[in-house]
Amino acid sequence: MIILFDLDGTLIDSTDAIVSTFHHSFDMHNFVKPTDEAIMALIGYPLDIMYKELGVQEEKIWDFVYTYKEEYRKIATIKTLLLPCAIEAVKEASKIATLGIVTTKTGKYSKVLMEHFNLMGYFEVLIGREDVQKPKPDAEPILNALKLLPKDEDVWMIGDTKLDLISANEAKVNSIGVLSGYGKKEEIKMFTNVIFNDALEAVKYLKTT
């Protein structure tokens, strides 16, 4: 079995880090700041898409992204928390499957975070934004992860937003939606029939399948 985990809202809570870094970038560029709610509603999308949706002009988006990344790497480990049961979920999953991370976050920062939490050693692969041309909801991130892992027909993607689940559907792999993050249950139900409160519940389910 292969289990692929999303990060934000699935294993970690980086809401504070993301929101504060967005505000920093808007301050640095003298741009009207969006509300916390507007930012949180877009978590899971690539940074350039988030800035576009928040009203930044096309030609300035990558300047904002650069400012964001410069600040985020300074504060990520300080302002990011593991979700309850995340450690147990990963440890239990490692007993029954080969593990990977598929995230829209920058991969190198994601690796630093996982090393900070002493969890990176459980994962055989980590696919981040810089590793793909087309991020989730495209199938590419999952397919790229699978190319780097031993072939296995029993593949599961665990994530908290429709982006994770659509990506899984496009990649023709199984999916589990979790309610520990940013996706609403009504929306998640549209893309998977398997839904649990958190990653640990999802892993316990997979131990019985």
Question: What do the predicted segments below correspond to?
Answer:
Residues 156-194:
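Acidic, Mg2+-coordinating phosphoryl-transfer loop and its flanking beta/alpha structural elements
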Residues 32, 57, 120-124, 152, ...:
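Conserved H-loop
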Residues 120-135:
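A short, structured active-site edge motif that brings together acidic residues
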Residues 1-87:
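N-terminal helical cap/lid subdomain that shapes the substrate entry/recognition surface
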Residues 87-95, 146, 165-169:
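Surface-exposed amphipathic alpha-helices with a cationic face
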Residues 74-101, 107-111, 139:
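Short, acidic loop-to-helix structural element flanking the phosphoryl-transfer center
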Residues 2, 136-165:
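Conserved Lys-Pro-Asp/Glu-containing loop-to-beta segment of HAD-superfamily phosphomonoesterases
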